[in-house]
Amino acid sequence: MERYSNSTREVAQDGRRGALMLSVSIKHPDSESFIDAKMTEGKVTGANVSVKLDDDFMKAVVNKTTYKQQYPVDSANPTTVKEIDAATLWQKIIHNAWKSAEPGVLFWDTIIRESVPDSYADLGFQTISTNPCGEIPLCPYDSCRLLALNLYSYVVKPFTKEAYFDYELFVKHVRLAQRIMDDIIDLELEKIDAIMEKVKSDPESEEVKGS
């Protein structure tokens, strides 16, 4: 985690530093250590940390029952299995979030149910994490395409009795914004191809490239 965090801190563009989300499933046997990652001051300062909570874990918290962790997380034949007290780990998440503002929580089963890419899982799309601030669930090699509209700018004659919201202009700009965001996806695909080609042509070992 420190390696990824430090690498991200070294990345900057136009004066803006890099951003990174590190997330792990609560089902992973090492998730408790992950949850404690930022309790030491000065550690993992270049990344946000979030834990993926599934429905079974939250039910175990409510019912005060045990919860099974395993590795690999999604394997039918895991090599490691561990029973934990769900409520105790939940309390640790709450305490750490209060103490250090992290970890964040991702209600993962809900995200997958509502995620558009996972509707096309048969075509290879799979949501694996989110952008650094958690707004957008993302697939591998995906990026967060964010666009903001200042709603105040559509208020005509603000702070007067004649004030009103210019819905016509707002709708026009929303359509243009959606068009821009869709075009960005096409440009992004070209950049991904260029990045992958650069990685393949680099002289580093396959172990380094894979990390």
Model regions and ranges:
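Active-site cavity-forming subdomains of large catalytic enzyme subunits
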Residues: 1-173, 180-211
